[in-house]
Amino acid sequence: MVFVTGGSGLVGRFLIAALVARGLPVRALYRDKVPAIPSADQVEWVEGDIRDALGLQVALQDVTHVFHCAGLVSYAPQDEDALQQVNVEGTANIVDACLERPGIRLGYVSSVAALGSKTGERAEQAGLPVQLDESAKWDLGAAHNAYSTSKYLAELEVWRGISEGLQAVIVNPSVILGPADWNRSSTRLLQYAYNQHTFYTPGNINLVDVRDVVDMLMRLTLNTPIKGERFVLSAGVVPLRDLLGQAAACFGRKPPTVAVPDWAAETIWRLEHVRSLLTGARPLITKDTARAGRRPVEYRTDKVQKTLGQSFRPVAETVAWCCAQLLAQRQEMTQLSS
């Protein structure tokens, strides 16, 4: 039996479909209602919450493999407590539940946000991106946003489990791209292109196809004895303008053409912060999202490609696939509502 958390999320929904296609029995956790995903009727759904330690221990009965994909992604200041509870405490509960049942293998979906960073002054002075891989160390003295900190602390919980005998492997994907809800996760970038906005922020973004994340996660967890290691997953880095431009072209829409200068982005996030404090509404842009991509970073994936003998899909191919899928979904919804 394979147990999956985060089945309603981008990685979880594709992972469950892949596990079912392989003929594996799947048990998955849900909170409020069973997510409407492909193969949902072939899954044993268990109502619960990763913050419920006792409930998780019961859910792992007869389980041989656990895929922990659940997590909260947010840069809003009001979500700091939730990030701690879901990402850190939730992962600690998963680890403890696995340790209660010796022999379980855990595949944990972390993030490149948990890698830490290095200064890379020479590279930056030469106009080159700073390169990071699995050996990157977390700088305890540096300023980190709440999301990155939560993923780092969550990963520490997995390393704790490993030190106590847990067989676990960790993947650190960059921004995962795939066709999902228009209003969730990275798909909002594609929605931005579809809506024909005029402005874009200069900078780069590291991307990886959700299909590659799922395939590599499954192979590392199910098909290898590897334990106590982490693997960076990223197809490459592209300018945000190019990503939005390609998506707009796939949708047959006009791409954004006006770059937002840094000073304007700095002003906007401050105004949004004040508005959020006064109204309680979530900010449309935060300090972290305003500054994302300014510092050029590139993630090296030599380790996973050598280990699995597998390369990543090109970003352009992923964008084209996502846009085609999203257009098909949109047309289907239009037909159903007409």
Model-flagged regions — what are they?
Residues 142-169:
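Active-site Tyr-X1-5-Lys
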Residues 162-207:
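NAD(P)-dependent short-chain dehydrogenase/reductase
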Residues 216-284, 301, 306, 311-338:
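Mid/C-terminal beta-alpha module of Rossmann-like enzyme folds, strongest
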Residues 93, 153, 184-185, 201-222, ...:
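Substrate-positioning beta->alpha
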Residues 29-34, 50:
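N-terminal Rossmann-fold cofactor-binding loop
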Residues 1-22:
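N-terminal Rossmann NAD(P)H-binding glycine-rich loop of SDR-like oxidoreductase domains
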Residues 43-89, 97:
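NAD(P)H-binding glycine-rich loop region in Rossmannoid oxidoreductase-like domains
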Residues 89-146:
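Conserved Rossmann-fold NAD(P)-dependent oxidoreductase catalytic core, especially the SDR/UDP-sugar
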